[in-house]
Amino acid sequence: LALYFVTLQIENAVFRFVIENRTKEDDQISYVTSASVVLLVMAGASTLIIIAINSLYAIPYVTLVTTALWAQSLYLFVSNLARGLGRNADYSIASFIVTVSSLVINIILIVGFKSGAVSILVALAFSNLIGFVYFVYRLHVWKFIRVGAVNSKKIQEMLQYSLPLIPNAISWWIANTSDRLIIIYFLGTAFNGIYAAANKIPTIYTTIFTVFNTAWTESVSLAINDSDRDEYINSMMNNGFKLFSFVNMGIIVCVSLSFRWLIGKQYEEAYNHIFILLVAIFINSMCSLLGGVLGGLKDTKVIGWTTVVGAIANALINFALIQSIGLYAASISTLVSYLIIYIFRLKAVKKVVYIKVSGEYLVQCLAMLLIVFWGYFYRKSIINVVILIALTVWGIFQNRNILFPLINSIKNKLAQNKEE
């Protein structure tokens, strides 16, 4: 949580303004240098605050905590620089390196040295430092730093973009944390375990969507000033809606067929909540697509306040209903809060960009969702197999403009590799 204040979300501004100036080297240098000054000043000030607090109240592992904050801040900065420059291969490789090195360090410290909780901080700090060093080497980061390139107007411009993203990030954190705190307080840790189990499945969907969303935020920022941007954004929003509604419903049906293997009989009560949370996470992903458009438009204020409103709604609904409907309050409040964010963001985007969801597809999607809903709660394997087959045929047909070119592209790539 402290990381949001340490960085002021300036790394997101680096991505947005570097991608906008890919062909303007001097502007890139000025933005990166100016942003690095903001980061170093904030990280330095945060270090002094930590030292001051530690002198009054001892902070456990204070050196590791400070190192981890610096490491994460620096890594986030250069990783967003890589995205802004279009170095997506390096971005993916670095993400892999950070994940693997964190895992290896944790295993060595926990298994080999029995270090316990401290291993998490060590792994966090050093894995991010490794990723940072990789980016510095691959991107030649020093070429983007020039002492005389600091520009106060560019700093102001970037902060206007990044500061509204702080309440946005904090609100997401509060929304995710408040559910669990409210559940523990009113219902107990056993129910929190059930809710945690129910949330495991939506993370599968989130992992798939994140890959798409990373590419989307880049492409929409590149296209935002094009003459045909409305046509492009509308097309991509509709394609994203079609593809991920299909993926989401596919996961729902697969869960109904394999719940006891995936989650286990001891968490049987999680079954009903998974459906609600999967629908909620789909709406959340559509919020992210709209957030990408707003980011491209540099309207981060809307991103910030819509998330704050959603987080408040989530907490209020949860508090109001948890004593009457129990754990369902958490899953329903999550769904409703995401829907609120989606509605507000859609209205904001439609004021600037033409977006129209296909009415015909929406009717078909709702009809298919009702069928999936019936099969999910009826819980007969043979029926859900039939539904899965029907859903697959329907989904492939609806997404043929995406899937068939993708398949042909993969075939051509494989053919080229064979010839080489």
What is the predicted function of each stretch?
Residues V98, I120-L139, S152-S221, A280, ...:
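Transmembrane helical elements of multi-pass membrane transporters/channels
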Residues Y4-V6, T33-I59, T63-L64, N234-N284, ...:
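Alpha-helical transmembrane segments of multi-pass membrane transport and lipid-handling proteins
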Residues T63, A117-L121, V133-N176, S219-E231, ...:
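Interhelical loop/hinge segments that connect adjacent transmembrane helices in multipass membrane
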Residues V62, T189-K200, A270-F275, S331:
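Small-residue hotspots at the loop-to-helix junctions and early N-terminal turns
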Residues F17-R22, A71-S95, L278-V309, V349-V353:
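Membrane-interface junctions at transmembrane-helix termini in multi-pass inner-membrane proteins
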Residues G375-E420:
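Membrane-proximal transmembrane or re-entrant/amphipathic helices at the cytosolic face
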Residues I93-V141, V309-A313, L327-A348, L388-L391:
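Hydrophobic alpha-helical transmembrane segments
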Residues V6-T23, P202-F241, G291-G296:
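Helix-loop junctions and terminal segments of transmembrane helices
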